[in-house]
Amino acid sequence: AYRSLIVEVNYVKTAGRLVGDTPEERAEYFSDTMLRDREYVASVMADYPEMVRLFHIRIKNALSYFRKIINDTSANIRSIETEINGGEKLGRLLGVVTGSGDTHNGGQSVARLIFENERMIIYKPHSLAIDLAYNRVMEKVGDYSESLGYGRFRLTKCFTAGDSGWTEFIHSSSEPGSDEEIENYHKKLGILSCVLYVLSAGDMHSENIIALKESPVIIDLETVIQPRTVIGGSEVEQNVRDKIINSVKGTLV
């Protein structure tokens, strides 16, 4: 669909129909003026039937996904309030914001659910059984960390039912921590790196780990346990790749 629109933009540009002195102004004219002209849009749809077919699929999938989010959340709201919101009512659902992270299974992606008490809950279109198992492991690891004087790990509250999951929305800490908190954070990050290495986790970069005061918090555990794929190449390339993957560096922490 995007490629079709790029072709169309180039066509109307060559025809001298775009208005504006800069690329930004011409792009704005195309989106805000030309795409609001019903006759022009009808002609574009007639010229690019495959694009229209893809649009129909995307719209159908989006509507189906929104229905699933609302239905699943409504059916499990009491458990969500208990496990994530301390038993307090979340109130009415005011909005659903999608488009965060990768898409799966017909365009489904992580969504933010906005409730009337200004509380946000994260909806994920898959089971969070791994997240719950990870939390149980980290509770035990937290005992060790606490015994060393570093404090316990901050874990994400979550609930799962069937092929859906909900987690609390965690804001990263914007205030600088004390020297002790910063020291504890880095020591905990070292412990966490060890755990992730043992689990053969990967993709644990800065977008998946939030700094919350003195504790690193993983907010995306999709790759905490993952299969190792065999990639072709020379023996030297494979050896180098294996050494990286089978090391702490392979976790990307």
Kindly give the residue locations of the regions a language model identified:
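Catalytic activation segment of kinase domains across protein kinase-like and atypical kinase folds
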Residues: 175, 200, 205-253
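Conserved ATP-binding subdomain of kinase catalytic cores across diverse folds
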Residues: 1-201, 206, 215-217
